[in-house]
Amino acid sequence: MHNDVLGDIHIASRTLSKCEAIIGSILEKKALRRPGILAAHQLDAMDIEATKALIRQTKCQIVLNAGSAFLNMSILRACIDMGVAYIDTAIHEDPKKVCETPPWYGNYEWKHREACERKGVTAVLGAGFDPGVVNAYAALAAQAYFDRVDSIDIIDVNAGSHGRYFATNFDPEINFREFTGTVWSWQESQWRANKMFEIKRTDELPVVGAQTTYLTGHDEVHSLSANLDVPDIRFWMGFGEHYINVFTVLNNLGLLSEKPVVTAEGLEVVPLKVVKAVLPDPMSLAPDYTGKTFIGDLVKGVRDGVEAELLVYNISDHEAAYSETNSQAISYTAGVPAIAAAMLIARGDWDCHHMANVEELPPVPFIDLLGNMGLPTRIRDAKGDRAFNAAEFCGERRKIARTGA
């Protein structure tokens, strides 16, 4: 639990029993590093005043928002008002809107940058794996390995199996919303629109082998395009044919719509919420999950006047994640980086006193810490495939500095 760094920990949710179950698992695994407070609280995080009251009651200094993306603005506002640090793992979404005009961060989070700056509030946006770690990978490549970066392709593959006919790995409502709207990518230094499943690629990847992925709209493209001088930034996600077929049928029938409909009995329902209600709870998938995940950045550019390519990536194992945390690897890769971000704020490395996306913060402390927390990073380039080494990063950075890049 890393409470040796983070101190007292309070877990809050609208459903108190979920918090109590988490605490029970932590205590059963004897995961606390030292004696301290580990408490559960019931909270409607959409209620800004209630969130502020809980912050005041617990005297917390860092709030990690691991809830639905619909909650971001309420929790962020409470943190700004109370002067405490804020971390989230995904971009804010309005439940009534799908796939808004890019850049998505400009529609919500970035509107609060001045308020964070004025109050000296540290707000780290998108500190999961993607977004999050992949942003740090992009910054690492740009800072240490290239004189000029021409393209960043972020590749996310779940090569595991949960054994169910059909299920999503996290909240179905959020999951499906990612794929029912326009696919936005950053190409030739401008926004480009495509349809879901319109464009695909196949890569030979470490450990998981040949994988087909599809161009997908995703959070990190919307900050990297603003913060890094890179003309092409794309996100690719792996989908099996079965998933695509079921998704397509649901979508064509209108069952993935967020707009209410009225049944013959006069009952108003949101089709997407009905689908969510009948699908397996993502938490129930973990015990039977097998296989591995791959998430990484394929970066291309120029180094010393020569075209170069770098793959920075992580491999995680579903069964290992369940053994440690009772969660599957997708939840594990999303949750561990957020804890690492909180630890870096507590240590001072990332306590920047303003709003920042992950690529705007030092990448090495983050990547290094994650390696010690169960998410090791590997690098593949012309020199071969090897574990990330912070000393190598420092050496590469000095080399680029000497050449005047």
What does each model-found stretch correspond to?
Residues Q143-A405:
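C-terminal catalytic/substrate-binding lobe primarily of soluble NAD(P)-dependent oxidoreductases
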